[in-house]
Amino acid sequence: DVYKSQDIYNEHGIIEIQTRQLNKLRDKLSVFLNEYQVRVVYPMPYEKYLSWIEPETGDITSRRKSPKRCSVYDAMFELYKIKAFLKNQNLKVTLLLIDMEEYKLLNGWSYDKKRGSVRYDRIPVGIRKIVELDCPQDYMQFVPEELEKNFTSADFANAAHIDRQTAASVLAMLNYMEQVKRVGKTGNAYIYDIEEHY
């Protein structure tokens, strides 16, 4: 029963906390948004320390810092999976960049037992950034200030310090949310401009 599976329900509506695969929320959102305010909270690891647990003894070994850091731009790939709901006034989104400790069991199939291992737990230890997306105009937070007129995804990538594939995902979302618009092409690249709202 989809009504029994929400994370939090109070006088403000429903809060859904989803750490990945936002597409799994589609069925819930199609029901909940007809009657309730829904806030989707999507936490992403900014700084992560990984520790390994020996499953037979419980000993914790080799804590190390992960070289990968997420940025708020990395959320776009997941948000695109629920884009059909993002213009609904009852849906709000909160992106969290958090520091965390992650624990995995040394039970994988590789010689060091790390590949194919099972994640045991993730523990948040701090919040680095909170981004609230309560209406389409809030998505303008993702547009670097120096971009004004006639820019490409390569220009966007350089200004935002992200790779071009991520920039393309961000611009696809911003175009869908009617915050930027395609105004032409140069070679194979689309040219974008900021959408004016009066």
Q: What are these model-derived regions, one by one?
A:
Residues 162-175:
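Short amphipathic alpha-helical interaction segments
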Residues 2-3:
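Short, small-residue-biased leader/transition segments that mark boundaries at the very start
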Residues 28-89:
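A basic- and aromatic-enriched beta-loop-alpha substructure that forms the phosphate/nucleotide-
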Residues 175-186:
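A short, conserved structural fragment
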Residues 62-134:
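Long, low-complexity, charged/polar intrinsically disordered regions in eukaryotic proteins
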Residues 6-21, 25, 32, 38-40:
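Conserved catalytic cores of phosphodiester-cleaving nucleases, focusing on short active-site segments
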